[in-house]
């Protein structure tokens, strides 16, 4: 069974595209899509008002189980940033994306996204697996 760690780009795509929502519905209902605090914080900032903020917050509580950021994340991120800098790709990787990647790699989860930066990180860190939400579940 494949378990995923959610990036905000994937969640937005799922929420806006009915066919993708259908493709991922069973995986989400089975609890196989997880979330981590930096991703939730990033996503919650997109709420237009308090009502939408509460809707998003409940979505995370009820559907996307929390995955803890590992204590070793800073070391993993530092290694990946150095590899990215050596290839001139370090400016493309946000702090939130790197934390999501470090968490997914640590817990053996596949990053679920709609953002090419995760493909870049996978090329820099062989232990990271990623999946574009448009490709459907593995």
Region spans (language model):
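Active-site neighborhoods of divalent-metal-dependent phosphate/nucleic-acid chemistry enzymes
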Residues: 65-112
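A secondary-structure boundary/capping signal
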Residues: 7-8, 39, 114
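Active-site-proximal, substrate-binding regions of enzyme catalytic domains
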Residues: 50-73
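A general structural signal for well-ordered alpha-helical segments in protein cores
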Residues: 21, 40, 53, 74-78, ...
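Short active-site oxyanion
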Residues: 1, 30-33, 62-65, 105-110
């Amino acid at each position: 069974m494949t378990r995923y760690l959610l990036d905000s780009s994937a969640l937005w795509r799922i929420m806006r595209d009915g066919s993708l929502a259908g493709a991922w519905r069973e995986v989400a209902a089975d609890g196989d899509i997880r979330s981590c605090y930096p991703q939730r914080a990033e996503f919650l900032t997109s709420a237009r008002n308090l009502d939408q903020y509460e809707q998003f917050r409940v979505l995370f509580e009820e559907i996307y189980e929390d995955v803890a950021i590992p204590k070793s994340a800073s070391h993993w991120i530092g290694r990946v940033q150095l590899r990215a800098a050596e290839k001139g790709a370090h400016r493309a990787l946000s702090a939130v994306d790197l934390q999501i990647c470090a968490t997914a790699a640590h817990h053996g989860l596949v990053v679920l996204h709609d953002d090419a930066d995760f493909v870049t990180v996978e090329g820099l860190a062989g232990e990271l697996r990623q999946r574009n939400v448009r490709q459907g579940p593995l």
